[in-house]
């Protein structure tokens, strides 16, 4: 067996050389995989004979079985979008009114996939996708096959690095030519190709497809004093950093840079879809903070989207989970931004009236934010005798009278028994960010509703195997899996349930903030809007919406029924202890700690109720300083901020 292991190792390494370096494989993938699996089985049986150069011990030789979920220690926020000079000016005015000394760093917005790289003692431990910003997927083995990502840093740092993985235009062209030759469907664009590559289970394919990265953020280290310095430090650590950026305090300069980049973007070897403008000084970033969704110190200017002409054939009106009735145009198919588009949103009735959009019109279609197809304008020169579009007065689902509130642009169905509203609400409740009930998608929801088995979310927890087997197309194995997923959802932390209820203005992050503060859903029956508005990151509108919902008798009954069904109503995450010694204090870590690493120190401070930030400002209450503390310690002393050492922290 030892001889066979040596033979297989040599043979597979030869094939790896042909595949990766020479790009001229002499055997098929299936033949390689067959030999590889034989080697794996032998090594599992005779582990003492595993050779150091075995391809099973090398990055690039792994056949993965799937991807595990990964919870980010630090959330990855999205960015506020801007589509005009006016929106950039408004951003500038908001920043400069509070911080006249603010500078901006404008960076290219790479059209790729957000990734997070976690290093412990300088070793790459985790590579993950962004996901929903809180939970992504662990794609570490694939990340290790991206050549420009360091597997080991020159310093033994505990740090999280963020950036974009992308596919160059050249690599994209090559892969599509290969797929065409092999009779495989071509990728629509480099971003799709990069996304498909990162989700490959065969890491050899990832290695061959030549993904690359640009990194732009570090989290968990003693912060640099600016975003520009962060980029320089990342480059020093061996990461790929995009050199196309501009530092200026003038939004006029930033706008000129954006215009210049837009005019020459096709000359770049990779695709971009805009420019990100960030406040350069990290101390100002710290003071500006975040909304529930995005940092207040950054904005993403998106280049105007590609536009195409198409004819509106018909219009569908659909009811969403909040009762909003949305018009969608059915179009003659057009190729747009690498995909075939045959439907586009018309937004709402006010938009239709403003643009005077009619069935039969030739319209200009674009992808809003390069994602959602939308109708931009009518091509008046091609209009003949089209008549104004009839606007529905009755709900397309339940036929009840639609309303158009003065302060809203949309038509709304207010019938709580509307079939579409109920079904969309149930789909939302079961969605991944909410209760995450796998198998309870639109098709199954429609069957359950049509059979009279579900009318609200509590009915989900009354379903039996017999109920599900009554439905057309539902087999016993699928039914058992769905019931298991429903049972598993009962144990979710309560913020997922709160989000799943679909209360207006209450998103996933707001749900978490609310439950972190109040602990369980039943407590929300007695809170006031003013109390809720005091939570950092929320506001009075969210508070009023939540209170209005929980003042209804139906809400009390709903919680009682869910509780009776065994659904957890409590927040299971770590809550700030209001009695904790450091509750409510803003704390900065600086210098080298001897007994704790940076992550452990941060976790201990947070357990004691502190908010740990990266830079010293007037809002800082306390600085914990280790040895070799530098500018942060000096600034804290200058501002008269309380300073403690590591031993003090250990003794708490």
Swiss-Prot record:
SMART domains: BRCT, HhH1, LIGANc. It catalyses: NAD(+) + (deoxyribonucleotide)n-3'-hydroxyl + 5'-phospho-(deoxyribonucleotide)m = (deoxyribonucleotide)n+m + AMP + beta-nicotinamide D-nucleotide. Keywords: DNA damage, DNA repair, DNA replication, Ligase, Magnesium, Manganese, Metal-binding, NAD, Zinc. NAD(+) binds at residues 29-33, 78-79, 107, 130, 164, 278, 302. The active site is at residue 109. Its EC number is 6.5.1.2. It is an enzyme of class 6 (ligase). It holds the Pfam family DNA_ligase_ZBD. Its cofactor is Mg(2+); Mn(2+). Zn(2+) binds at residues 395, 398, 413, 418. One of its GO terms (biological process) is DNA replication. Residues 577-652 form the BRCT domain. GO terms for molecular function: DNA binding; DNA ligase (NAD+) activity; metal ion binding. NCBIfam families: dnlj, PRK07956.1. Belongs to the NAD-dependent DNA ligase family. LigA subfamily. DNA ligase that catalyzes the formation of phosphodiester linkages between 5'-phosphoryl and 3'-hydroxyl groups in double-stranded DNA using NAD as a coenzyme and as the energy source for the reaction. It is essential for DNA replication and repair of damaged DNA. This is DNA ligase. The lineage of its organism: Bacteria, Bacillati, Bacillota, Bacilli, Lactobacillales. The gene is ligA.
């Amino acid at each position: 067996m030892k001889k066979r292991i040596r033979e297989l190792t040599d043979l597979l390494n030869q094939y790896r050389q042909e595949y990766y370096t020479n790009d001229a494989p002499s055997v098929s993938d299936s033949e390689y995989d067959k030999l590889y699996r034989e080697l794996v089985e032998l090594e599992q049986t005779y582990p003492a004979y595993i050779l150091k150069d075995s391809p099973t011990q090398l990055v690039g030789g792994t056949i993965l079985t799937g991807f595990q979920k990964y919870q980010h220690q630090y959330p990855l926020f999205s960015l506020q979008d801007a589509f005009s000079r006016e929106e950039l000016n408004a951003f500038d005015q908001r920043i400069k009114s509070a911080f006249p000394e603010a500078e901006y760093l404008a960076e290219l917005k790479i059209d790729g996939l957000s990734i997070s790289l976690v290093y412990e003692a300088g070793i790459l431990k985790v590579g993950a996708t962004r996901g929903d910003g809180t939970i992504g997927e662990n794609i570490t083995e694939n990340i290790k096959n991206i050549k420009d990502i360091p597997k080991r840093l020159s310093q033994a740092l505990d740090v999280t690095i963020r950036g974009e993985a992308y596919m160059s235009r050249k690599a994209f062209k090559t892969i599509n030519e290969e797929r065409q030759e092999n009779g495989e469907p071509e990728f629509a664009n480099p971003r799709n190709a990069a996304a498909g590559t990162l989700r490959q289970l065969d890491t050899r394919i990832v290695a061959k497809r030549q993904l690359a990265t640009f990194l732009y953020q570090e989290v968990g280290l003693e912060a640099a004093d600016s975003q520009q310095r962060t980029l320089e430090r990342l480059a020093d650590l061996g990461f790929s950093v995009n050199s196309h950026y501009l530092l200026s305090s003038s939004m006029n300069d930033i706008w000129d840079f954006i215009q210049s980049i837009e005019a020459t973007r096709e000359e770049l070897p990779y695709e971009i879809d805009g420019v990100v403008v960030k406040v350069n000084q990290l101390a100002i970033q710290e003071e500006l903070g975040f909304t529930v969704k995005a940092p207040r110190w950054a904005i993403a200017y998106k280049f105007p989207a590609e536009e195409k002409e198409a004819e509106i054939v018909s219009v569908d009106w659909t009811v969403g989970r909040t009762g909003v009735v949305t018009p969608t145009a059915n179009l003659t198919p057009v190729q747009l931004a690498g995909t075939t588009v045959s439907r586009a949103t018309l937004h709402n009735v006010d938009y239709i009236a403003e643009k005077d959009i009619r069935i039969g019109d030739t319209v200009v279609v674009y992808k809003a934010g390069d994602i959602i197809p939308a109708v931009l304008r009518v091509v008046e020169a091609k209009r003949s005798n089209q008549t104004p579009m009839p606007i529905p007065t009755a709900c397309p689902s339940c036929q009840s009278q639609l309303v158009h509130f003065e302060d809203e642009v949309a038509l709304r169905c207010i019938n709580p028994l509307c079939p579409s509203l109920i079904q969309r609400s149930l789909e939302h409740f079961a969605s991944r960010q909410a209760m995450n009930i796998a198998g309870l998608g639109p098709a199954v929801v429609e069957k359950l509703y049509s059979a009279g088995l579900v009318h609200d979310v509590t009915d989900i927890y009354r379903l039996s195997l017999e109920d599900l087997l009554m439905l057309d197309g539902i087999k016993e194995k699928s039914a058992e899996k769905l019931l298991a997923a429903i049972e598993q959802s009962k144990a979710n932390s309560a913020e997922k349930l709160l989000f799943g209820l679909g209360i207006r203005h209450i998103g996933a992050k707001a749900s978490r903030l609310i439950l972190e503060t109040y602990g369980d859903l039943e407590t929300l029956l007695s809170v006031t809007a003013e109390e809720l508005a005091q939570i950092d990151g929320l506001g009075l509108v969210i508070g009023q919406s939540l209170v209005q919902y929980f003042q209804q008798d139906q809400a009390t009954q709903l919680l009682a029924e869910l509780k009776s069904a065994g659904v957890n109503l409590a927040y299971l995450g770590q809550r700030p202890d209001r009695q904790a010694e450091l509750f409510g204090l803003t704390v900065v870590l600086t210098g080298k700690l001897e007994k704790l690493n940076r992550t452990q120190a941060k976790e201990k401070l947070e357990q004691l109720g502190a908010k740990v930030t990266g830079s010293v400002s007037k809002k800082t209450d306390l600085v914990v300083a280790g040895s070799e503390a530098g500018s942060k310690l000096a600034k804290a002393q200058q501002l008269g901020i309380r300073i403690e050492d590591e031993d003090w922290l250990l003794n708490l």
